[in-house]
């Protein structure tokens, strides 16, 4: 995922300003206005771990559901990546139909990678005078997922739907009665989340650039620190320049707390304390600004000043980009339950990966984000009288990425002294989801349906596979300078004229095909034989540390995708890594490290982008469904069958 965030920083740009120019089942529920269906989407909930915790008696509400209804593994997508998986669920289509194949796609005409679910277009013509330019048309943000979402079918039948934080649904589809966008929603910088860290320590982090964050040197002068929160480029300036909002921190004499002043806002923070949401306004021109919001964490005042600022989130009270349907629904939620993380993946995993926050500090930040979500869920559920409600929880997924290793003493980076204190973190989060299920059941009646599902499972990420390096070593990818075997990314040392195949994204492999890729080197007639050869050799590849296969499945897209509407962006092969092995972050963006398979020593230590059969999700219901749903792709159709709707997926109406 860190590679995905790098794309946001490099190619995301000015999206924001471009657009801105313990219960008994079925008892205790209140009287409902009509029959209700509640779908709880628990991202990354693993079937095996859930089953173990149920057997241990630690998830009593899940157990009651399993005894009354259904508890089964839910087949995930190929590949098992969240935007792909949730798109399968939303549309009832596989990637060949909905067009989302990975977190990362590439333009075969330029070979530039981009985020798969959203495209941002700046405004068109401008009026220029001196250093200023006035856009004569607004920008736009387009959802790239194709296919008809299941809730649109319900709305056409007169069933109101509320879709909260559905991944791969930014900007919101506009076809539900109420929507709030989720995973895929950027911060105002146009990234998936870029934090700021202000420090008076000279040469902090060795002067290196942090992945997913920016270090800002500051000075303490007379007990005062002055700094600035960075926003996006100002679209009204001919020469690009970032907008900034200044802040001042006044230190007390004992170095125990600061008074933080941001615009008209003041906050008193002690060391180790998080602020609430602080409104931030970036001035674009004297008559127009861009509103955002940040949370601050005062990490230290001695010996150095250290202040963390969250990514500047879209302000739900004045959204710079569309994040809800209707447009004022986000503001309604914020007024009712308080400001909240509008960023699609709010848990700041990058701050932990870079060492800006400790594990304990990260977990506190994740708890704050999770508490906001649970508070909002209670508000929405209390007002849900009829129709279908989908509500998404992503806390377990993001924390599992960072905290799976403490449960795995066999992980190569396992540290008994450090990890033992976090060994129960993930399991405690599972217990928290069990409590959410209990609260939901308490509000449902006898005729209501509860569906609990996850998009994929989870496991330990022990070994990293550099797929582009494997292609290099096996003669499929050529280098301009063969003596240089440490290309950091974006194919900077690739000799395209002699390259037959390359990898991009977490599971995709592409033929360098004439007529598709601009630097194409392989005749279309040679494609099939080349793919067969690469697949056979990949499946024979063993991990030198264990002697076991490193890759257990390799699919041709024609074998697993039913449509071929996206041949320009679809990978030719989808690689299913053995459980415990994942494609590397370096290879995902065109990097070619010297070795092929290495230990994963990254703080990001749990994952699911492997062989899809190794990481199924879960399906749990309070009664048997009328129609079976063995996979994510069939689940929405099974839910629609509860309403007497059998034909799904259906074509989108023009």
Model segments located where?
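Secreted, luminal/periplasmic, and some membrane-associated catalytic domains
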Residues: 33-35, 42, 56-57, 67-73, ...
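Structural motif
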Residues: 39, 388-392, 451, 620
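Second-shell loop/turn segments in exported
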Residues: 46-52, 139-140, 625
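Low-complexity, glycine/alanine/valine/leucine- and proline-rich hydrophobic stretches
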Residues: 578-627, 635
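A solvent-exposed, charged loop/short amphipathic helix patch at secondary-structure junctions
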Residues: 125-134, 359, 405-424, 593-600
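Bacterial N-terminal signal peptides that target proteins for export
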Residues: 3-15
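C-terminal motif of bacterial Sec signal peptides marking the signal peptidase cleavage site
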Residues: 25-26
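A long, amphipathic alpha-helix that forms part
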Residues: 30-32, 49-50, 363-389, 399, ...
